[in-house]
């Protein structure tokens, strides 16, 4: 089995705890202090090692990191509330993030960061590589439940965001992944398409993505999903193109929610582009990076370049990975 970490989630999760040790202090100054910075990085390593040790037979570990998203080019108000106000320590925060990335690369872990790609985009591409190309099991470690939309029979998600640890998988693969569930965690089977519908129809306040219909909430969504076919064979798949997917959802949603089809289609098409992690989205982009590559080309190039570069072969402990004894 391989493990794929959401690097930005791990970094923010650890920092949220680390920062509580310095309440009332200038966090920029704290992060500039070499000794305190190393304490923070050691805590990141401890979290990483503990997670890997929770699973057996881990072959490769990949960590993905965000860059400035292509979605801002398409939707300038993307994540408006999150990006318009920066904390005073933001520059130091990013410097330490860069240092952590360099540290992981130096240790032989595969680190993936591609211009224009968010971690979500890279998690999808790496899931295709491990799950489809290699036909190997992949466990994605993130607190972002939206990523469950990319689960397959051999790609699952481990949410370590709280004391209530959960390993998510598709319903048809639960009998396999139940043997991978670490002690103290719960196995939860979820249909990936239902996760996508949640994002597309209800939007995402944290990303400033609107819902398709005002007042249409989670309970209404559950009722809508109950009207859909239960047989996966007649449902859209990851191979479905953008318009057929939008049309499939809009046709059924407009009837159920009594929304004009054209109105529903326009909003659903927009939300699909913003939230769906699928090849049809990337194939439809006009984004080009500094090397004149499309986003999809750039991500595939990164996977091809790094897929055989994994070198770490020691124990997943602070002493072995960080290179210094625990005091």
Where are these regions (language model features)?
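Domain-level signal for Mg2+-assisted phosphodiester chemistry and nucleotide/NA-binding surfaces
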Residues: 1-105
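Generic preference for flexible, low-structure residues
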Residues: 19-23, 27, 77-79, 154, ...
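Short, flexible coil/linker elements and helix-boundary hinge sites characteristic
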Residues: 23-24, 33, 135, 243, ...
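Low-complexity, acidic/Ser/Thr- and charged residue-rich accessory regions of DNA metabolism proteins
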Residues: 40, 263-268, 273-327
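Extended two-metal-dependent nuclease catalytic cores across DNA- and RNA-processing enzymes
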Residues: 84-288
């Amino acid at each position: 089995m391989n493990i794929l970490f959401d690097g930005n989630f791990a970094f923010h999760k650890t920092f949220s705890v680390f920062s509580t040790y310095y309440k009332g202090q200038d966090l920029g100054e704290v992060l500039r202090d070499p000794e305190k910075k190393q304490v923070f990085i050691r805590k990141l390593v401890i979290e990483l090692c503990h997670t890997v040790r929770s699973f057996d037979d881990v072959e490769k570990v990949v960590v993905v990191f965000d860059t400035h998203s292509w979605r801002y080019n398409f939707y300038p108000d993307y994540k408006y509330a999150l990006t318009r106000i920066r904390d005073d320590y933001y520059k130091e925060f990013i410097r330490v993030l860069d240092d952590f990335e360099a540290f992981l690369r130096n240790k032989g872990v595969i680190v993936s960061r591609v211009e224009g790609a968010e971690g979500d985009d890279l998690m999808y591409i790496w899931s295709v590589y491990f799950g489809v190309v290699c036909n190997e099991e992949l466990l994605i470690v993130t607190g972002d439940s939206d990523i469950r939309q990319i689960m397959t029979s051999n790609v699952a998600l481990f949410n370590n965001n709280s004391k209530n640890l959960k390993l998510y998988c598709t319903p048809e693969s639960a009998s396999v992944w139940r043997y991978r569930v670490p002690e103290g965690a719960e196995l939860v089977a979820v249909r990936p398409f239902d996760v996508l519908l949640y994002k597309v129809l209800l939007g995402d306040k944290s990303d400033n993505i609107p819902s398709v219909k005002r007042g249409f909430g989670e309970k209404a969504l559950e009722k809508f999903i109950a009207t859909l076919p239960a047989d996966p064979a007649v449902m859209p798949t990851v191979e479905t193109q953008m318009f057929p997917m939008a049309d499939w959802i809009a046709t059924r949603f407009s009837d159920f929610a009594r929304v004009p089809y054209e109105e529903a289609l326009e909003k659903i098409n927009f939300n699909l582009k913003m939230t769906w992690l699928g090849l049809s989205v990337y194939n439809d982009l006009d984004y080009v990076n500094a090397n004149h590559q499309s986003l999809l080309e750039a991500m595939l190039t990164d996977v091809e370049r790094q897929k055989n570069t994994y070198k770490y072969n020691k124990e997943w402990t602070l002493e072995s990975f960080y290179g210094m004894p625990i005091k």
